[in-house]
């Protein structure tokens, strides 16, 4: 055997003898290896998609059919409620009517009659003093004959100016009854109705215990203007 070389090397590349490189195919004339790898990957991807679709069809990804809901049972209609009963309310205190009144007023035959008149041209009584016996039924006639065209009344109070002022204030708050004292006004013993100019009115009452008492007019401003008088009750 001779190791002598001839003028060229006997070593040949594997690729040249096989007709292609590793990335060109397995043998000469065959498809490139990269193409074969792409085809294999595509086939695998297709198989994966088919498997996923099969699982979805089998129920893995199929949307569940909604279950029918139970029909709600009809509820009973609410029982009719009765309207709340009206609570009794306390009636407001009745205002005094424009009429005679007072704690000493009586419905008896008078034993004595007395007349008082309004001054014709002033806010005053023509008679500024009276005298009557105690515990006597008296009818007082009041004549409002004046030239001023104003209203007047006659009110007997159980005391002096301090008591008269309180009675007068109560009457001022009773405009709906033309400023006569309201019923049960403390210390208002007797009064006539409020009279227009030219009218007359009367009140029957029992005289109080012996002493000195004021009588006034309770039309607004008249008592403060000095329209008052004194009743002296004798034993």
UniProtKB/Swiss-Prot annotation:
<keyword id="KW-0732">Signal</keyword>
<dbReference type="InterPro" id="IPR033138">
    <property type="entry name" value="Cu_oxidase_CS"/>
</dbReference>
<dbReference type="InterPro" id="IPR008972">
    <property type="entry name" value="Cupredoxin"/>
</dbReference>
<comment type="function">
    <text>Probably a soluble electron acceptor for the integral membrane protein electron transfer alternative complex III (ACIII).</text>
</comment>
<feature type="domain" description="Plastocyanin-like">
    <location>
        <begin position="111"/>
        <end position="235"/>
    </location>
</feature>
<feature type="binding site">
    <location>
        <position position="217"/>
    </location>
    <ligand>
        <name>Cu cation</name>
    </ligand>
</feature>
<dbReference type="GO" id="GO:0009767">
    <property type="term" value="P:photosynthetic electron transport chain"/>
</dbReference>
<feature type="binding site">
    <location>
        <position position="222"/>
    </location>
    <ligand>
        <name>Cu cation</name>
    </ligand>
</feature>
<feature type="region of interest" description="Disordered">
    <location>
        <begin position="1"/>
        <end position="27"/>
    </location>
</feature>
<feature type="compositionally biased region" description="Pro residues">
    <location>
        <begin position="69"/>
        <end position="86"/>
    </location>
</feature>
<dbReference type="GO" id="GO:0009055">
    <property type="term" value="F:electron transfer activity"/>
</dbReference>
<feature type="binding site">
    <location>
        <position position="152"/>
    </location>
    <ligand>
        <name>Cu cation</name>
    </ligand>
</feature>
<feature type="propeptide">
    <location>
        <begin position="57"/>
        <end position="80"/>
    </location>
</feature>
<feature type="signal peptide">
    <location>
        <begin position="1"/>
        <end position="56"/>
    </location>
</feature>
<feature type="region of interest" description="Disordered">
    <location>
        <begin position="64"/>
        <end position="107"/>
    </location>
</feature>
<comment type="similarity">
    <text>Belongs to the multicopper oxidase family.</text>
</comment>
<keyword id="KW-0325">Glycoprotein</keyword>
<feature type="binding site">
    <location>
        <position position="227"/>
    </location>
    <ligand>
        <name>Cu cation</name>
    </ligand>
</feature>
<dbReference type="Pfam" id="PF00127">
    <property type="entry name" value="Copper-bind"/>
</dbReference>
<dbReference type="GO" id="GO:0016491">
    <property type="term" value="F:oxidoreductase activity"/>
</dbReference>
<protein>
    <recommendedName>
        <fullName>Auracyanin-B</fullName>
    </recommendedName>
</protein>
<feature type="compositionally biased region" description="Low complexity">
    <location>
        <begin position="87"/>
        <end position="100"/>
    </location>
</feature>
<dbReference type="InterPro" id="IPR000923">
    <property type="entry name" value="BlueCu_1"/>
</dbReference>
<keyword id="KW-0249">Electron transport</keyword>
<keyword id="KW-0479">Metal-binding</keyword>
<dbReference type="GO" id="GO:0005886">
    <property type="term" value="C:plasma membrane"/>
</dbReference>
<keyword id="KW-0186">Copper</keyword>
<keyword id="KW-0813">Transport</keyword>
<dbReference type="GO" id="GO:0005507">
    <property type="term" value="F:copper ion binding"/>
</dbReference>
<feature type="compositionally biased region" description="Low complexity">
    <location>
        <begin position="1"/>
        <end position="21"/>
    </location>
</feature>
<keyword id="KW-1003">Cell membrane</keyword>
<dbReference type="InterPro" id="IPR028871">
    <property type="entry name" value="BlueCu_1_BS"/>
</dbReference>
<dbReference type="InterPro" id="IPR050845">
    <property type="entry name" value="Cu-binding_ET"/>
</dbReference>
<keyword id="KW-0472">Membrane</keyword>
């Amino acid at each position: 055997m001779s190791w002598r070389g001839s003028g060229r090397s006997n070593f040949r590349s594997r690729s040249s003898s096989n007709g292609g490189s590793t990335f060109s195919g397995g043998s000469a004339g065959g498809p490139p290896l990269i193409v074969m790898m792409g085809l294999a990957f595509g086939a695998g991807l297709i198989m994966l998609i088919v498997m996923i679709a099969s699982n979805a069809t089998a129920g893995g990804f199929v949307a569940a059919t909604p279950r029918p809901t139970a029909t709600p049972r009809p509820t009973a209609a609410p029982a009719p409620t009765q309207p709340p009963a009206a609570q009794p309310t306390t009636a407001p205190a009745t205002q005094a009517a424009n009429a005679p009144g007072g704690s000493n007023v009586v419905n008896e035959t008078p034993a004595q009659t007395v007349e008082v008149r309004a001054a014709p041209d002033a806010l005053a009584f023509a008679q500024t003093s009276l005298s009557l016996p105690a515990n006597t039924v008296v009818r007082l006639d009041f004549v409002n004959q004046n030239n001023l065209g104003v209203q007047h009344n006659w009110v007997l109070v159980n005391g002096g100016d301090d008591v008269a002022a309180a009675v007068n204030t109560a009457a001022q708050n009773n405009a709906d009854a033309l400023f006569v004292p309201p019923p049960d006004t403390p210390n208002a013993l007797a009064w006539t109705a409020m009279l227009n100019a030219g009218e007359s009115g009367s009140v029957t009452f029992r005289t109080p215990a012996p002493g000195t008492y004021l009588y006034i007019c309770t039309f607004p401003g008249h008592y403060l203007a000095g329209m008052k008088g004194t009743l002296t009750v004798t034993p």
